[in-house]
Amino acid sequence: MGPIAQLVELPAHNRMVRGSNPLGPTNKFAASVRLYFYRGADMIIIKNKEQIDGIRKASIIAANTLKYIEPFIVEGVNTEQLNQLCHDFMVQNNAIPATLNYHGFPKSICSSINNVVCHGIPSIKDVLKNGDIINIDVTAIHEGYFGDCSKTYIVGKANPKITEFVSITETAMNLAIKALKPGNLLSIIGSTIQTYVEQFSYSVVRDYGGHGVGLHFHEDPHVSHFHNKENEIILKKGMIFTVEPMINMSKNWRVVTSKKDGWTVRTKDKSLSAQFEHTVLITSDSYEILTLPDEG
């Protein structure tokens, strides 16, 4: 194990990352945010109670969206229909879909079918078939706060090996989340996931990972889902980030991005890929999953 990144609070006049204030000079949250610098990382925002409450509300809307869309994921539906349903649901719940027009992304959700790892673009041409798997990734903005989650659904009835694969992917995420608490290293996420899935001859996508979230769509730290010494960062109360492993149903973790649309990421060997995601808060002695739907 390499040296552990040290936590140092920067003076207010020197709270910079990559040459600029990540919150921007006019951000209404800037005055109340505590920013910390890690050697070997960049800048991680420690959220206060007001911000955590706001992020929790946004996260619940995102989770409720995934719960709402589940009965519509059936054979014969196209992903543009799913996109519109999710868009309308978020808007009706006073939220804005964060992906819409984000760096030019044209839709309100990501819909990734079968060998699409992430960032699939909804389309009327993508019609679900019995046995498909599809990941729906939703990020809701509510009152300026962000909540991010995703889930892989099975369309109809799939091959038992595929059903098992999807279940193992979700278990990998849950095992990693259960290992989180203040004082542990962020790298425990990747170590836990990689160790678990590789025993089934699956692999962890390395090109994409989780991220800090809450005041922005994407914040530091980057969260690796394989063992990575760059993630040897001490977890601290008030950190919020996503745990979102992308697992390939083969030993080949490599992916390729569509040259046509610049977004769609597929497995290089055309194997299936599954993903689950939660937004997670580090509490005083453990963790809290913020992206849980309302009961009922």
Where do the language-model regions lie?
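N-terminal, intrinsically disordered charge-dense segments
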Residues: 1-3, 28-41
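Short, positively charged low-complexity motifs
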Residues: 6, 18-19, 40-43
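Leucine-biased recognition of intrinsically disordered, low-complexity hydrophobic segments
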Residues: 7-10, 23, 35
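Alpha-helical hydrophobic packing sites
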Residues: 8, 18-21, 213, 280
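Hydrophobic alpha-helix-in-membranes signature
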Residues: 21-24, 243-244
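Active-site neighborhoods and metal-handling regions in enzymes and metal-associated proteins
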Residues: 37-296
